[in-house]
């Protein structure tokens, strides 16, 4: 996206009326990010994002792409699925500012089984591309053949053959933050398909006090 387009988006974000913002947390988040983008143009401490379960940092994600709009922004992007890691690095190629941790966040260091989908089936269109964001360490409805209401999913047999379990390394959240020298957090994002609390529960809110949590 061009610099002019980014400036236009930031300006429009600041133009959102307070009454509208109060009706939508997502819009308040947009204004927070726009303010960060404006502040970054005048120097100061670099904006720091931590995203656990980053997927590819683009698909169905309205927050992580702001890293490209906020000058000098930095991020620790945690993503355990190899297929997603490749897409994530392609979308955020600056290795100096955007650190990818190829692990899952757990309460103890080790390895963990992740339920996921075959990368080839995603790549050739056999499976919907949105399935790249559905990997989980829990037995989510999708992985168990149930729909959003917990009832048997009639379409489960179409994608069940492409389900697989993989072993990935796991680490505690604080270890990752310390390893990457994360001293402050402006935006903290978690999307772990049913295991979100395992991550949130480890964040020291008094220490980091993120301005945005999603």
Predicted segment positions?
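Phosphate/nucleotide-binding beta-alpha loop and adjacent structural elements of enzyme active sites
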Residues: 2-214
């Amino acid at each position: 996206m061009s610099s002019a387009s980014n400036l236009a988006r930031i300006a429009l974000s600041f133009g959102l009326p307070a009454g509208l913002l109060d009706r939508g947390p997502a819009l308040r988040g947009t204004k927070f990010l726009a303010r960060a983008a404006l502040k970054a143009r005048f120097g100061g401490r670099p904006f720091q994002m931590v995203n656990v379960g980053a997927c590819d940092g683009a698909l169905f994600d309205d927050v992580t792409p702001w890293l490209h709009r906020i000058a000098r922004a930095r991020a620790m992007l945690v993503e355990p699925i190899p297929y997603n890691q490749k897409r994530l690095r392609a979308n955020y190629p600056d290795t100096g500012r955007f650190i990818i941790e190829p692990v899952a966040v757990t309460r103890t260091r080790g390895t963990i089984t992740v339920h996921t989908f075959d990368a080839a089936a995603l790549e050739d269109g056999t499976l919907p591309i949105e399935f790249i964001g559905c990997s989980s360490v829990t037995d989510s409805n999708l992985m168990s053949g149930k729909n959003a209401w917990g009832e048997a999913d009639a379409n489960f047999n179409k994608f069940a053959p492409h389900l697989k379990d993989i072993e990935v390394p796991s680490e505690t959240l604080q270890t990752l933050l310390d390893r990457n020298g994360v001293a402050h957090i402006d935006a903290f994002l978690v999307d772990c398909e049913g295991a979100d609390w395992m991550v949130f529960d480890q964040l020291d809110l008094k220490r980091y006090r993120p301005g945005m949590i999603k």
